[in-house]
Amino acid sequence: MPGPWATTLTFPGHNGGFGGGPKCWLFWNTCAGPRRVCPKCSCPICVWHCQLCFLQKGLGIRHDGRRKKRGTRGKGRKIHYARSITESGGQRAPNCASSSASCQTWALKHGINC
């Protein structure tokens, strides 16, 4: 029987009931470690396997220095900016691609070369 640092927990079974679920020691003697290898599953039973499983799977705290990778911006992606007021001769240009018909008609109407 472990010392006073251990707590006995009753877990819900995979069938959803609390009756007769597996009993486990949450905070084991850290020198001895858990009795079995930590499972890779993140179900509610495996989260409570040991203190390390609870911190990593249950709370999402990782102490191994790994960080989530961020996606980088694609190389072929371009952003179209509207022309400044001084370039367009005092007229504001619409913020659209120059190949669209509405942009070309607006530019012809106001005397601006697209």
Curated annotation (Swiss-Prot):
Q: Where is this motif: Nuclear localization signal and RNA-binding (TAR)?
A: 66-83
Q: Where is this region: Cysteine-rich?
A: 38-53
Which terms under GO biological process does the entry name?
positive regulation of viral transcription
UniProt gene name: tat
Protein name, UniProt field: Protein Tat
Q: Where is this region: Core?
A: 54-65
Keywords for the protein's UniProt record, in alphabetical order: Activator, Host nucleus, Host-virus interaction, RNA-binding, Transcription, Transcription regulation
Q: Which organism is it from?
A: Jembrana disease virus
Q: Which GO CC annotations does the UniProt entry carry?
A: host cell nucleolus
